[in-house]
Amino acid sequence: MGTSSHGLATNSSGAKVAERDGFQDVPAPGEGAAGRICGAQPVPFVPQVLGVMIGAGVAVVVTAVLILLVVRRLRVPKTPAPDGPRYRFRKRDKVLFYGRKIMRKVSQSTSSLVDTSVSATSRPRMKKKLKMLNIAKKILRIQKETPTLQRKEPPPAVLEADLTEGDLANSHLPSEVLYMFKNVRVLGHFEKPLFLELCRHMVFQRLGQGDYVFRPGQPDASIYVVQDGLLELCLPGPDGKECVVKEVVPGDSVNSLLSILDVITGHQHPQRTVSARAARDSTVLRLPVEAFSAVFAKYPESLVRVVQIIMVRLQRVTFLALHNYLGLTNELFSHEIQPLRLFPSPGLPTRTSPVRGSKRMVSTSATDEPRETPGRPPDPTGAPLPGPTGDPVKPTSLETPSAPLLSRCVSMPGDISGLQGGPRSDFDMAYERGRISVSLQEGASGGSLAAPARTPTQEPREQPAGACEYSYCEDESATGGCPFGPYQGRQTSSIFEAAKRELAKLMRIEDPSLLNSRVLLHHAKAGTIIARQGDQDVSLHFVLWGCLHVYQHMIDKAEDVCLFVAQPGELVGQLAVLTGEPLIFTLRAQRDCTFLRISKSDFYEIMRAQPSVVLSAAHTVAARMSPFVRQMDFAIDWTAVEAGRALYRQGDRSDCTYIVLNGRLRSVIQRGSGKKELVGEYGRGDLIGVVEALTRQPRATTVHAVRDTELAKLPEGTLGHIKRRHPQVVTRLIHLLSQKILGNLQQLQGPFPGSGLGVPPHSELTNPASNLATVAVLPVCAEVPMVAFTLELQHALQAIGPTLLLNSDIIRARLGASALDSIQEFRLSGWLAQQEDAHRIVLYQTDASLTPWTVRCLRQADCILIVGLGDQEPTLGQLEQMLENTAVRALKQLVLLHREEGAGPTRTVEWLNMRSWCSGHPHLRCPRRLFSRRSPAKLHELYEKVFSRRADRHSDFSRLARVLTGNTIALVLGGGGARGCSHIGVLKALEEAGVPVDLVGGTSIGSFIGALYAEERSASRTKQRAREWAKSMTSVLEPVLDLTYPVTSMFTGSAFNRSIHRVFQDKQIEDLWLPYFNVTTDITASAMRVHKDGSLWRYVRASMTLSGYLPPLCDPKDGHLLMDGGYINNLPADIARSMGAKTVIAIDVGSQDETDLSTYGDSLSGWWLLWKRLNPWADKVKVPDMAEIQSRLAYVSCVRQLEVVKSSSYCEYLRPPIDCFKTMDFGKFDQVYDVGYQYGKAVFGGWSRGNVIEKMLTDRRSTDLNESRRADVLAYPSSGFTDLAEIVSRIEPPTSYVSDGCADGEESDCLTEYEEDAGPDCSRDEGGSPEGASPSTASEMEEEKSILRQRRCLPQEPPGSATDA
């Protein structure tokens, strides 16, 4: 609010000047023309001439008083001085005397403090000396100026990528061996002995230009890495010509993991469509895949691990790119596969009618969509069956597990008694990759397992609706036979045994007894949902009778598409079981269906006993993949970038798009002046470079790896081939590109384009804490309670998502005492990568010194939290000094801890000035338990109770957790004079509704209220202090005494300065509890200024400076003149968004613009307006005067910005009904407050009923990890929607190479692989239908055929030519 402390100035929420009948109305910024305030009359004020006269009169009176006092002083008779000399101290001698005296006291106190042999009787005296010492320090500190924050640029390690590549000469291994190791990702998961065994089979191959590496018809049984030269990977086009889909440069590889899997499983097939040729003379390294079989024969435990990595690559790389980003669904799966004919068979009974009276049959309809819970319900005999091993622990549980659980588990230093204490094998790593708990006995033995005895203490799971379960009974005669599904009694047992034999045959299980007590027979009614997409607890399903329909949710559409139909004899769910990833489709029984089920934990027990079982399961996955997926497996790369290496540099050619699988990347732009600026950071699941690749523009920024990062690489030629093969991909690309361009256009709708406002053009990219996966915690000193701090933070993070805490003790307990040795670095890196995949965020607690574990924590971190004690002297810890001397690329944040009963933050600037650039400095008010000194056992017992309760969302630790996970909630308060008092009422209602606030900002009166709330964090205390200030604003004498000659302004501003200073004293913005900013208008540079540090009262006053009434405030940093921020941005929600807020609650209290103005034609006479005004019988006209026109011109940019904010998706726009209050109605504080409070209660009550608040607090990554949320780093203001379709649908003509492997007439052969696997499609008659079926079965078959055709499950016609696309 731009006014002085008198009652004649107006608020900063408006600034119109309307001279009317000798009066002038001065609205605040954001206020419009006449009639904005609910029909309120103009506010009279003292004209300039009258003001000068009053000022002159006051000056005359003051002069007369001074003259009178001087005259009276001169008339006082002087007393004669006594005889003799008079001695007196000079002032300077007096100052020196007392100064020396104080310093003597200080030195004596200091020397006495150093003496350690102080007796107990001298302690009171020492306390007095300490108090004197503190008083002396305060006296000496008065002369010092308040320190200001030193402007620091990010260090070179943050903005610059390494210029040198990896030095292979420093390794004792041959260069070609390291070359193969670094460029084939699947080999990176081998341990060193296995990898060296493989490299014995590696050979060199030299190719001339035009020579083929392989072509259709030749075996696909090798991995190729280009050492020098250039290879081209080709696929046949629709006209029989080869189309180059990928250029393989030195360092890249040509391989298909599905082909490797086929060779390992013994189902090798020759190439059908893919060929590779040398574009110029080249040298390649060739590794035959047969070498894998020899290695696995020697190291059988590694077989499961490697197959698992191949499956993970298939799901994460191939499916992520093709389904999540390109929108392909049933094109990824083959619909032609030959199932087994299980029933009817000799010796088995025919189908009979179900027993309707059986208690196991639960009648449900298909419309109800009942779901089968994957578990074991009670046994029909009455004895409870235990659930499968590895039931996940609740996120808030802190019970000591019997084995380390990887899914939503809680670990702490005191909770290591139940952890395995030895090194893990490859199979144990596979267990953890599949998110299965490894028991201590099994992990120690590592040998073959018999069927383990079930733990009788485990509780049975709930009986699923719509499905019943049969568990084989040893004593069948005792039960008298159990009716099941279409069979009864002993018939079910016979079917069960026959089905297990068929399953053992399919999976090549040598010992069928491994299936005993691990296989369950299920029967599902029609319409039952067996498993849903996204489920974590998955199982294997072996269809016996009926069929299971597999559906997948379509991207950007609220519908599911049928991928395929699992017929009798087929396995479903093996991909999710092997990878440990969530299920990527939904299983539904369209009709009654019978199947065998093996839980994930039971399947891993079988694999431990016979590792080769994983080959059969993996082969069933590979056989279901379509030929198109096998082609894309060659084309889509799985690449890695080491920490500090550049993924690409600014100005490079854009030839591909990247998807981050894990790790972190940073984007930096170099301006024309050579200055480098941080654009943003990318985390897991982000899409990079899509706009540049589609528009074929050079790279706009340099992107380098913050830490070791894995990516999926989609080449440009591959994207063109996909568009030719599946034209519907163009729609998805238009959607992706339109999101990026739309985000740019919304930024350009502001008053100034791009970053001219001082705001980065992309909001989410500017948040350094967005999309974090790992956080390292580093102490400043040994006094920091690190264990308690990390546990408190973990407790707060658990409310957002699964969180894992790791320290050196936990690592040694889980992976063995030698886990941190350099020889175990590979295994530790792989295990940590698994933890990042299984958890929302991983906390790394460093040691107190620079140990190998501390170095590992810093290497793995996306962000580093430097934790200090706020009540201690600002110091730089020893570990921090080592950190400053190393090139750490992760962003740093300084976290200061404060006691709950202690004073507020102070001297934050000194903490920050001692360190290099920090991206943030949160203050945390900690509970008393954090600083209590307890033994590890007592601490463990205490936090067991803490973790049993849900974290308080209003605590500072919860606020830090929301910041780290990108779920910040910001509160933005607009300007509007006395109407801004309603902000406090809305704040009170916001507190009562339970909505936390993590960031506060505002303009004008909003900056004042926001600063109070950021300091107090209490609406009640904010109301009390704001009411006192509002009362002072009703004074009349102070404004009169503050009048001056109106050259720059009518008032000097000193009275208003005193009123603001009395509220905030010398508080710094850095010392506020909540992060805070306000907005001012820089009239020196004609730009908006956003203030996040510095003197609080000065920048609040600057944001409330109304033109003409208060002089501009000189910025103490650079001397620029600052005015009211409402002139340019009266509701800065966009600033809060650019600072990383996920949701912005914006409260607007500005007056509404008058838009109903009179039409007067092409010219206007002032005499006519005067007549209309003086004539009481004339119709009133609404025409703005000169002052109002100037005011509207001043607020054009503010109005535009407000409209953009109101229409944005991230902003919750609120406007209380306060239009009936005037700008200077500070005397009506309570009435305005009540209006805001009642309005807030109504709004937030609706939010609570509509579940809006819970959605605000829900982590966005947990809702939809597949959504591309990033605005791309490249912005093209000239790009519009008219040429959008042309950009994304442009298909380059294929390279005119005639393929020797296929003629024009053999196109169908080229586009179909594995013809020997082809069989009847999914619409054929089910082989599993028993003889003697009811006549309605045929009609059901026909009905199912039509359904499958409608859902695109049947084979489609081959796509058209490139012109059709």
Swiss-Prot record:
A nucleoside 3',5'-cyclic phosphate 1 binds at residues 186-313. Residues 971-1137 form the PNPLA domain. PROSITE patterns: CNMP_BINDING_3, PNPLA, UPF0028. A nucleoside 3',5'-cyclic phosphate 3 binds at residues 620-740. It catalyses: a 1-acyl-sn-glycero-3-phosphocholine + H2O = sn-glycerol 3-phosphocholine + a fatty acid + H(+); 1-hexadecanoyl-sn-glycero-3-phosphocholine + H2O = sn-glycerol 3-phosphocholine + hexadecanoate + H(+); 1-(9Z-octadecenoyl)-sn-glycero-3-phosphocholine + H2O = sn-glycerol 3-phosphocholine + (9Z)-octadecenoate + H(+); 1-hexadecanoylglycerol + H2O = glycerol + hexadecanoate + H(+). GO terms for molecular function: lysophospholipase activity. Glycosylated. This is Patatin-like phospholipase domain-containing protein 6. It comes from Pongo abelii (Sumatran orangutan). The lineage of its organism: Eukaryota, Metazoa, Chordata, Craniata, Vertebrata.
